[in-house]
Amino acid sequence: MSEKYVVTWDMLQIHARKLASRLLPVEQWKGIIAVSRGGLVPGALLARELGIRHVDTVCISSYDHDNQRELKVLKRAEGDGEGFIVIDDLVDTGGTAVAIREMYPKAHFVTIFAKPAGRPLVDDYVVDIPQDTWIEQPWDMGVVFVPPIAGR
């Protein structure tokens, strides 16, 4: 990945609220299935904004911080996804998204961020990201003092 896109907590909440507004009316949803781990925080934000209490997870491992590797389903929510929102932070190459679509063919699959290769696999997303860009999510970063450029 040549570029980095840094996401702040404020930006993430703004994007999640925008996505939540597109998922109204809330009565159409039975619950949320968050893709662990990237979809956990966005899933919590959607659950809060939409007032949804039924939240489950599908646990899929496909990354080690910045390296993609073999896909493993560690835990899945039951059913075919009918009436459920499946949320992940990002659709990238589409590997995880294909697995989600196979497991939950009737779910409404959404992400906050979408790269071109995976974009056709989601029902909705908020932010376009170039394919060669790595996203630094706020839960992967700490707040650190940065000295002034002039060194004062």
Swiss-Prot record:
The UniProt entry lists membrane topology as: Peripheral membrane protein
Binding of xanthine occurs at 92, 135
Q: Name one GO biological process term.
A: purine ribonucleoside salvage
Its required cofactor(s), as named, are: Mg(2+)
Q: Which InterPro entries match?
A: PRibTrfase_dom (IPR000836), PRTase-like (IPR029057), Xanthine_Guanine_PRibTrfase (IPR023747)
What Gene Ontology terms describe where this protein resides (cellular component)?
Answer: cytosol; plasma membrane
Q: Which residues bind 5-phospho-alpha-D-ribose 1-diphosphate?
A: 37-38, 69, 88-96
Q: Identify the Pfam families for this entry.
A: Pribosyltran (PF00156)
Q: In terms of domain of life, where is this protein from? A: Bacteria
Q: Which GO terms describe its molecular function?
A: guanine phosphoribosyltransferase activity; hypoxanthine phosphoribosyltransferase activity; magnesium ion binding; xanthine phosphoribosyltransferase activity
List its EC numbers. 2.4.2.-, 2.4.2.22
* UniProt: guanine binding residues: 92, 135
Pathways involved: Purine metabolism; GMP biosynthesis via salvage pathway; GMP from guanine: step 1/1; Purine metabolism; XMP biosynthesis via salvage pathway; XMP from xanthine: step 1/1
Function, as annotated: Purine salvage pathway enzyme that catalyzes the transfer of the ribosyl-5-phosphate group from 5-phospho-alpha-D-ribose 1-diphosphate (PRPP) to the N9 position of the 6-oxopurines guanine and xanthine to form the corresponding ribonucleotides GMP (guanosine 5'-monophosphate) and XMP (xanthosine 5'-monophosphate), with the release of PPi. To a lesser extent, also acts on hypoxanthine.
The entry's family comment says: Belongs to the purine/pyrimidine phosphoribosyltransferase family. XGPT subfamily.
Cite the record's note on assembly: Homotetramer.
What protein is this chain from? Answer: Xanthine-guanine phosphoribosyltransferase
Q: Source species, please?
A: Klebsiella pneumoniae subsp. pneumoniae (strain ATCC 700721 / MGH 78578)
The UniProt gene name for this protein comes to gpt
